[in-house]
């Protein structure tokens, strides 16, 4: 029996050789491999395959998966494949072929009466996003991020205090305890960073022992060489990550001074281009060092005709500056440079910048990490053409490079890749399903720990779930004990060993960070390029390995007005 490609795709989703457009971008992914078996595909519904004695076996709950996502198109750092995905006990059990092993060939995901079915036909499946630059200014950020496809948030803060409005620091053991307790309320994986600005170990170690999974150095607290050295020394002892916002004013030294203070030790440099803060005008040089793990924040992603104009006001508010004070205005203007922002686009496309995050409500938009990542990818394809690793008919390599920037690479950087960050067997089942036309913009279904935490949902009084108005709503995994079983609170090894989760009465599952200190930039997948960066101090032009980096700002972006009223 034969069936046309179009009919097959309509029924079971695309297969090998089919291409799928990502939203309204110029990015196309092509199916590289299909793990399902032609003629033996499983699908749920009236007259379909997943019925008793057909695609559903007689096996008990212990031998079948809890949930199967059928015929999904998986996009992850490791490839673009069509497969069924089996979930068991909150984790991804297997990727492959689902069905009834008694009568079907090649089944490695058994379906039984104890199995729920999520229809993945015609859908793109990705890992949940990881945002590692969160100012915990208000709890409502968490729902906004979740509805955008982000399932892990790392950062610091205590609410709308001046310190939190500017820095991602949960300062001190008392505040750390309160924030860890608050994290129980949310269907989101959460880890908190403490304040790293101190020149002696005690106040930093207290925060690590209280549960901090990392320490944040910020210029507003004084990112001096002494503070940097001490903070990294504490991190080395406790296997946690350090994030840094460097000294824009070059008061305690220049970029070379800060790089020297690192002493070759691993560090995550926030907004490494500099508009979000850092040595003016050349913090961007840091992306060329093996121990530096560089990220961007999303307001400069990508470079558009509006980017420069909006940044000045943002900066004045976020860093408690006064527009009536000339020195404050000069400080702000020193950070906003067309040339380095343009270079940032290209450095992402080359894989020299490795991650993208939000800088939520503090010069960044918590719900736009994923959208702005793909807007950057589209802009770069239109301006720079295909990448060397792409096929003649697809942008698979570029897609894998860019999705790694907000999934696996942040997970590796912050020591949580053993739990989250990719669609791989054994990992926490934090997964997002997208209709291709809405990919990267509006997810259809968000799973946390194998259960549905959020979804588009129609009129609650409708006779079916689809009538308008359709908007995002929390689902059952967002409530009560279910959220405790399906979301993680991350803590340091020291805090876990000391019994901090029990002492605080935490109810969520606990994840423990590890492997932070040995990470090198070359470990960051598809994003490990180490260029030699030069910045002209007079005109701010940027060169990488001698090549001038410049691109025009975009006048129009995809994933924008077609999808949003505002």
UniProtKB/Swiss-Prot annotation:
Catalysed reactions, as listed in the record: urea + 2 H2O + H(+) = hydrogencarbonate + 2 NH4(+)
N6-carboxylysine, modified sites: 216
Single Gene Ontology MF annotation: nickel cation binding
EC number: 3.5.1.5
Urease domain: residues covered: 128-566
Post-translational modification: Carboxylation allows a single lysine to coordinate two nickel ions.
Primary location group: cytoplasm
Active site per database record: 319
Annotated positions binding Ni(2+) 1: 133, 135, 216, 359
Binding site for substrate: 218
Details of cofactor binding: Binds 2 nickel ions per subunit.
Binding of Ni(2+) 2, residues: 216, 245, 271
Pathway info: Nitrogen metabolism; urea degradation; CO(2) and NH(3) from urea (urease route): step 1/1
Membrane-spanning intervals of the chain: none
GO cellular component terms, A-Z: cytoplasm
Entry's Gene Ontology BP terms: urea catabolic process
Quaternary structure annotation from Swiss-Prot or TrEMBL: Heterotrimer of UreA (gamma), UreB (beta) and UreC (alpha) subunits. Three heterotrimers associate to form the active enzyme.
NCBIfam families assigned: PRK13207.1 (NF009686), urease_alph (TIGR01792)
Family that this chain belongs to: Belongs to the metallo-dependent hydrolases superfamily. Urease alpha subunit family.
PANTHER family hit by this protein: UREASE
Name of the protein in question: Urease subunit alpha
The species this protein was found in: Pseudomonas aeruginosa (strain ATCC 15692 / DSM 22644 / CIP 104116 / JCM 14847 / LMG 12228 / 1C / PRS 101 / PAO1)
Gene this chain is encoded by: ureC
